Structure formats: C-alpha cells, structure tokens
From Swiss-Prot:
GO molecular function terms noted in the UniProt entry: toxin activity
Name this protein carries in UniProt: U1-ctenitoxin-Pk1a
Keyword Disulfide bond part of the UniProt annotation: yes
GO cellular component labels: extracellular region
Subcellular location: Secreted
UniProt source species: Phoneutria keyserlingi
Protein family: Belongs to the neurotoxin 02 (plectoxin) family. 01 (Tx3) subfamily.
Lineage: Eukaryota, Metazoa, Ecdysozoa, Arthropoda, Chelicerata
Length: 45
C-alpha cells in the first residue's frame, strides 16, 4: 500500500540517511516521517 511505498522512499530523504538511521523512519499519514530519526540522533548520535 501507500505506507509501504513511503517506506521505500525513506532511504531517499536526506534526514533519514544521515548516520545510517534510514531504517528508523516511521510511516505516518502515507508519508515518511523522520522525526523519530532526529530523536534517535539526539540520544545516540
């Protein structure tokens, strides 16, 4: 579905690929939401 497509496109978003956190992307409202990635970078970056 659309969420699955959003997951695939996550890897193409700069905020997601920084420091290899692309797999932490969350699909929200059929769009890639990188907010969780930013939070992880604050804690582990």
């Amino acid at each position: 579905g659309k969420c699955a497509d959003a997951w695939k496109s996550c890897d193409n978003l700069p905020c997601c690929v920084v420091n290899g956190y692309s797999r932490t992307c969350m699909c929200s409202a059929n769009r890639c939401n990188c907010e969780e990635t930013k939070k992880l970078r604050e804690h582990f970056g």
